């Protein structure tokens, strides 16, 4: 913005992130196990956008924002499971029951 004396003034609004940037931010924050509402706040979603995002995460398999959220959480779930399996294979008495539960989950499919 330029004032009447042609000097620049700072913009009062920040540029909004691109759709890809927003999806990446959501995925990264979800991977850090942030709540849906916290992610909405950190990405400057309006209250209406927040409600839509919360609804999408709970009810939509096709919404790109919901997919990014689920994908981020699943990456963390994968990392945690890998650690548990690694510790179980090394004889950890705390990790072995968890690894057994993971095996039972997969038998149901």
Q: Which residue stretches match the model-derived regions?
A:
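Short, amphipathic alpha-helical "recognition" segments used to contact nucleic acids or chromatin
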Residues: 15-34
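Short Lys/Arg-enriched helix C-cap and helix-to-coil transition segments
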Residues: 61-79
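Short, basic interhelical loop/turn and adjoining N-cap
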Residues: 41-55
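Short, Lys/Arg-enriched N-terminal segment that forms or immediately precedes the first helix
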Residues: 2-14
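DNA major-groove recognition helix of helix-turn-helix
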Residues: 30, 54-61, 65
């Amino acid at each position: 913005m330029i004032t009447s004396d042609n000097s620049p003034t700072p913009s009062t609004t920040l540029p909004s992130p691109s759709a890809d940037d927003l999806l990446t931010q959501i995925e990264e924050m979800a991977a850090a196990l942030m709540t849906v509402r916290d992610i909405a706040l950190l990405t400057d979603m309006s209250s209406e956008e927040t409600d839509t995002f919360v609804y999408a995460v709970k009810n939509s398999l096709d919404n790109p924002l919901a997919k990014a959220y689920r994908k981020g959480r699943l990456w963390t779930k994968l990392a945690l499971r890998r650690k548990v399996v690694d510790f179980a294979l090394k004889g950890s008495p705390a990790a072995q029951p968890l690894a057994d539960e993971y095996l039972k989950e997969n038998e149901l499919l």
